[in-house]
Amino acid sequence: MTHPFLFLKWLVEHFTQGTSLENLEHYGFLVHVTHAWLIMLLLTGVALLLKRRLSEVPGGLQNLVEIVLVELGRLADETMGPKGRRYFPLIATLALFILFSNLIALIPGFAPPTANLNTNAALALAVFGMTHVVGVREHGLKYFKHFVGPVWWLAPLILPIEIIGHLARPLSLALRLFGNMYGHEIVLVIFFTLVPLLLPIPMMLMGILVAFIQTFVFTLLAMIYIAGALEEAH
């Protein structure tokens, strides 16, 4: 998707003596990858800053982060149970990265990494891989017994269904997030191009809602998949 203006595009062209970002993309300098690294650096910087300034009486940013993490931890406990607490860092990292990747779309001149299918596919594959790692860690090789079902003579029928169902998970995670964020990005670009003042404001407010909803849906589904792997194999 062509943006009317990208801050990083201007920055690259300025410091590379007019080399366009489209030419640099052939060398791996992709817009969504650059913005994804920007989000990761931002989150890392905020985490290090909070670590240095931790206080028993939280205030400001620390208070906000604690509220978000406590509520997210409560949701994780309700969804995954006590065994799922060891996987909370993964869930929290996914939630924060996706949320900030969605919200950066509301800043003129920046493109959301989650509006690119490659970014979402990487996140979805990470959840997919971790789900089965959790299953094997908790149940050993017995984890794979649920792929063939409880009755052996139904295995030829159950096995393909289970495989298709599990492969559909990362596909649905990636496409759902991509479709919603890419569609919202198109609408924002159209409104900013046609009517750059006042009218895009309601769309930006809706964008905040979309960013939080999509973060919640992706994170909740990730927790549900991990919770399924944590359950006793049948």
Curated annotation (Swiss-Prot):
InterPro entries membership: ATP_syn_F0_a_bact/chloroplast, ATP_synth_F0_asu, ATP_synth_F0_asu_AS, F0_ATP_A_sf
Entry annotated with the keyword Cell membrane: yes
Transmembrane segments: 29-49, 90-110, 116-136, 147-167, 186-206, 207-227
Sequence similarity: Belongs to the ATPase A chain family.
Membrane topology of the entry: Multi-pass membrane protein
Keyword Cell inner membrane: yes
Any one GO CC term of the record: proton-transporting ATP synthase complex
UniProt function note: Key component of the proton channel; it plays a direct role in the translocation of protons across the membrane.
GO biological process: proton motive force-driven plasma membrane ATP synthesis
Molecular function GO terms recorded: proton-transporting ATP synthase activity, rotational mechanism
Keywords for the protein's UniProt record, in alphabetical order: ATP synthesis, Cell inner membrane, Cell membrane, CF(0), Hydrogen ion transport, Ion transport, Membrane, Transmembrane, Transmembrane helix, Transport
Subunit details: F-type ATPases have 2 components, CF(1) - the catalytic core - and CF(0) - the membrane proton channel. CF(1) has five subunits: alpha(3), beta(3), gamma(1), delta(1), epsilon(1). CF(0) has three main subunits: a(1), b(2) and c(9-12). The alpha and beta chains form an alternating ring which encloses part of the gamma chain. CF(1) is attached to CF(0) by a central stalk formed by the gamma and epsilon chains, while a peripheral stalk is formed by the delta and b chains.
Organism, scientific name: Syntrophotalea carbinolica (strain DSM 2380 / NBRC 103641 / GraBd1)
Cellular compartment(s): Cell inner membrane
NCBIfam families found in the cross-reference section: ATP_synt_6_or_A
Protein's recorded name: ATP synthase subunit a 1
Top-level lineage group: Bacteria
Pfam families: ATP-synt_A
